[in-house]
Every structure is written in C-alpha cells, then in structure tokens.
Amino acid sequence: EFSEPSFITESYQTLHPISSEELLSLKYESDYPLGLLRDPLQPESLQGDYFTIKQEVVSPDNMCLGRISRGKLGGQESFESIESHDSCDRLTQSWSSQSSYNSLQRVPSYDSFDSEDYPPALPSHKSKGTFKDYVRDRAELNKDKPVIPAAALAGYTGSGPIQLWQFLLELLTDKSCQSFISWTGDGWEFKLSDPDEVARRWGKRKNKPKMNYEKLSRGLRYYYDKNIIHKTAGKRYVYRFVCDLQSLLGYVPEELHAMLDVKPDTDE
C-alpha cells in the first residue's frame, strides 16, 4: 500500500530501458508486493512506458485511495490499475496552519449524499480583511439583495461550491426570506420557521429536487461536532452559529439585526 510519508500526492515517472527483474528490485521508500506488477514488462516495450502513482481522499471518513497505473506514452496500450486504501489523517493540515485567522473555528461543509460537492474543510482564504471589506465596493450588492450572498462568500473563502452554512447566512441576511428563516435577535441564533421551505430552497440551489429537512438536518448535525452550529436546547428548529463569524464576516450580530430590522423572538 502507498502509505509511506515521503510519497507525494501524485508523481509521474518515466522508466528507462531495464529488465523486469531490475524493475522489481527497485524500492520507492517502501517495498511493493510482486503482485503489484501483474503483467511483467518486456524489455523491448519499456521505452516510453511510465507509471503513475496517485493518492487522493475519497471518503468523508478520512480514507485515502492509492492508485498505480501503467500505460504507454503515445501508444494504444490500455491502462491497468491497482488500488489500496489507507488513512489520510497524516495528510490533513490543521486549520491554524492553513489560515492566518487562528481564532476562527474550522468551518467544514457536509452532504452525505453527494460528497464531491462539499470539501471536508473550508479552504484557507487568501483575501485580506474581512468579508465586509471584500464586498464593500462590489456594485452588484445592494439593499434589495442579501447582505451576505452565498456565492460572494464562497468566492471570498475560496471554498468552491456553495456550502450549507454559507447558504443559511444568505437566507438569514435576505429580508424576503424572514417568513421561513430569521435571526431570533439573540446574537448568532436563528430559527427555521418553515424548515421544509429552507430545505426546498437548498435543494433547488444544489439541483437536488429530493432534498428535504431530514436530509438537511443531517448536515446541521455534522456541524455540531465541528463546533460550527449548535442546536438550541428546548427550542424547536432553533440553532446558533458558535464559530467566530464576527472575525470572518466583519459584522457583529447586532449590526446585521439592525440592517434587517430584526425584532427579538418572543416565542418560547
């Protein structure tokens, strides 16, 4: 298995004409079983042949796939590959080492049904300043649009596809959405007044017509363990952002509440 720390994620190596016996005796930081090369190469066909070795994260449970493939440069020979799995914990980097915003909580995203849309963690954004600074002079943002558009936030953080937490912030900063999701007036706490409508809109945004609140809530529960969003005890459909949104966004919750004319929620 391709599990040695010195292996790079992906490398391409062109082999010089050598015998198959010499090839099998080579060591790349670790020994590979003889079964790895199922079809011994013929000396006359080695010129221009190459192997690719690749490791990539393929599952939410932090497993890694190692793959070695054989092919011929410019030739018609079909590829063959052998795969192995290994833990990729050692490949991941901590949030503090990736971002200058050391005080921020790790803000990952989650969708157990279509994981390629959701990277396991928020990429470190290279922009200077807060999101508020980032969008201050953007002409497309105006009073008739959300204060925090998900697409703009995704661009600012460099996260790629729009993530659930970004989408929720968009809805929460759009006055036209206050009938089904809104701030309660208590810091970063918010309530899904109509969770089915929130799920429907999330499904529409991600082109997933079968999305419902049960599926969406699984993503929210994933955020519990990551200390991004917590469920408010004793209140139905009430949640709270517990990560450091203020440092990321550049807004304090009271500022957003005032911009959106949020009235304190008196419901128990």
Swiss-Prot record:
SMART domains: ETS (SM00413). Transmembrane segments: none annotated. Residues 253-259 are annotated as: Helix H5. Residues 150-157 are annotated as: Helix HI-2. It is found in: Nucleus; Cytoplasm. SUPFAM superfamilies: Winged helix' DNA-binding domain. The keyword tRNA-binding does not apply. Signal peptide: none annotated. Keywords: Cytoplasm, DNA-binding, Nucleus, Phosphoprotein, Transcription, Transcription regulation. Autoinhibited by a module composed of four alpha helices (HI-1, HI-2, H4, and H5) that flank the DNA-binding ETS domain, reducing the affinity for DNA. Residues 131-139 are annotated as: Helix HI-1. GO terms for biological process: cell differentiation; positive regulation of endothelial cell migration; regulation of angiogenesis; regulation of transcription by RNA polymerase II. Coiled coil: none annotated. Its main location: nucleus. The keyword Transcription regulation applies. Residues 162-242 bind DNA. One of its GO terms (cellular component) is cytoplasm. GO terms for molecular function: DNA-binding transcription factor activity, RNA polymerase II-specific; sequence-specific DNA binding. Residues 245-249 are annotated as: Helix H4. Belongs to the ETS family. PANTHER family: ETS, ETS TRANSLOCATION VARIANT 2. Binds DNA as a homodimer; homodimerization is required for transcription activation. Transcription factor. Directly controls the expression of cytokine and chemokine genes in a wide variety of different cellular contexts. This is Protein c-ets-1-B. It comes from Xenopus laevis (African clawed frog). The gene is ets1-b.
